[in-house]
Amino acid sequence: MGSVVPEAINKLSAVHDNLRSDNPEDWSNAVHSCRRILQDLADAIYPAREDKVIDAGGKPKTIKLGKDNYINRIVAFVEERSASERFSHIVGSHLGFLGDRLDSVFQAAQKGSHDVIVSQVEADRYVVYTYLTVGDVIGLL
């Protein structure tokens, strides 16, 4: 991971420290760091670019690939690099779930809801999902 996203190593260290805390605010910080790690990964492997249009069952579908569309960019990378359609589908599904949840946590925090992460176990779960997903993606390099 360090060779692809060097700054992720420091972020993962901070995530680990935050998860060891008894403070729910630290758990939220750990989850926010997961979002930033995925954003950094997207920037490293599939920088923002113009949207692309794909054929989705005979209908054109626009895939947004801008700066804020970090999950779409990682999914596009996986789809372009993976020889296995099933692998692409599984990783894409995990990324979709994880990205939606991390973005929801982030948006709630922006609105002042500080109790979004209610347990250390929940925070641990997002960190593990992030770590495994990043590993799957980096494995395609």
Stretches with model-predicted labels:
Residues 1-4:
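Long, contiguous internal "core" modules enriched in hydrophobic/ aromatic residues
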Residues 6-10, 18-141:
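Amphipathic, oligomerization/interface secondary-structure segments
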